[in-house]
A protein has these predicted regions:
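A domain-start/cap signature at the N-terminus of enzymes
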Residues: 23-26, 31-44, 87, 94-154, ...
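Alpha-helical adaptor scaffolds
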Residues: 26-77
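Primarily recognizes the serine-hydrolase "nucleophile elbow" in alpha/beta-hydrolase
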Residues: 227-276
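Alpha/beta-hydrolase
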Residues: 154, 158-160, 258, 314
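Serine-hydrolase catalytic machinery in alpha/beta-hydrolase-like enzymes
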Residues: 156-224
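Catalytic active-site module of serine/aspartate enzymes centered on a nucleophile-bearing elbow/loop
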Residues: 327-343
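The feature captures the conserved acid-bearing segment of alpha/beta-hydrolase catalytic domains
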Residues: 261-330
Length: 343
């Protein structure tokens, strides 16, 4: 009997060792490897295990504290522990980060929204956003066309990033053969803070100030054909592009926007004035974008009032770039610049 207990103890020790060894296999050589494994845990709804993993790597990946504490809070929330979810966000603050303006807008955060502790967290987070706003400024990056010759004049494309993005995030996606080959493209980064690494265009007065300053700087430094300027952008950048083009913040020939938030301040008189200036535009969107109906309504108003505008909807995709975006962008440039020559 004693021997049986000894054997059982050895077996249990062996099992425990095997379990520990199994856990030790999850040593990650990079943040990417960890995120891939974390994604599997979330997809399998192993939220407690995901939370334990995230807690264990907070010190290992100090450059990713923002994402890791946010995902830790999500894991705790999905596991049904609201207090630990808030504690994870407070840990992010303790480690020096703050969260984005829209990070807690989704309904999944409803379980914590009535908590006084969460309200205190949000107040502190807003204070950090406001402090970051004091240091923020508009920035630009310029891409000149292939075989650029400063003695020639080139069409200009003013490109505006999406909400919560930076130029670094946006620039690789917003490009096309015509932009690379023919245009001076200025990527403008808003001064309006959305998150630690991202910005937005929702304040119309600030958007106007930023864009007018960027446009002035470009004209001073580059040979722009001011009669062939186009503005465009994604999501919040689409919002900024629409108000800038239709309300005549900048003297552009047209706009190209992808999945934009639709400005509510654009009146029929603005559209008629834009028509008189011979403005043209293209609105690209996707079937699962949550603003499709507002986008359709705006385009319907433009059509009714006689402003030439093209509408294109890509099926089976959400709020993001369609696979043929570059071709769609070049087609839109043709619609604005070439078709407008005969008017």
């Amino acid at each position: 009997m004693k021997r049986a207990f000894v054997i059982l103890g050895i077996v249990l020790c062996s099992l425990s060792l095997a379990m520990l060894q199994g856990q030790e296999k999850h040593e990650f050589g990079s943040y990417k490897e960890m995120r891939e494994y974390l994604g599997k845990l979330f997809s399998q709804k192993k939220y407690d295990e995901a939370a334990s993993l995230l807690e264990s790597v907070l010190d290992k990946f100090p450059d990713n504290v923002l994402a890791n504490t946010y995902n830790l809070a999500l894991a705790r929330l999905f596991a049904g522990d609201s207090e630990k979810a808030i504690r994870a966000l407070e840990e992010g603050h303790r480690r020096g980060v703050f969260y984005g303006l829209w990070d807690f807008a989704a309904k999944l955060w409803d379980p914590v929204k009535s908590s006084t502790r969460f309200e205190a967290f949000l107040k502190e987070n807003q204070a950090r956003v406001e402090e970051a706003q004091k240091r923020a400024s508009m920035k630009i990056e310029v891409a000149t066309p292939a075989e650029y010759d400063p003695a020639k004049k080139y069409p200009l494309f003013i490109a505006l990033h999406g909400g919560g993005e930076s130029v670094a995030d946006f620039k690789p996606s917003w490009t096309s053969p015509r932009l690379r080959g023919e245009f001076i493209t200025v990527y403008v980064q808003s001064s309006q803070v959305a998150s630690m690494r991202g910005f937005h265009w929702q304040d119309v007065a600030v958007t106007r100030r930023d864009l007018e300053a960027a446009y002035k700087r470009i004209l001073e430094q580059f040979p722009v054909d001011t009669g062939r300027a186009v503005i465009g952008g994604f999501s919040s950048g689409g919002f900024g592009s629409l108000v800038a083009a239709i309300k005549n913040f900048l003297p552009v020939r047209g706009f190209v926007v992808l999945c934009p938030e639709v400005p509510t301040t654009i009146g029929d008189e603005d559209i008629l004035a834009a028509k008189a200036r011979r403005l043209r535009g293209t609105l690209l969107t996707t079937e699962a974008d949550n603003r499709v109906e507002q986008q359709r309504t705006l385009m319907g108003r433009m059509e009714k009032l006689g402003l030439p505008a093209d509408f294109h909807l890509t099926p089976d995709i959400g709020h993001w770039y369609p696979k043929d975006f570059e071709a769609l962008l070049d087609r839109a440039l043709g619609f604005i610049l070439e078709a407008g020559k005969s008017e």
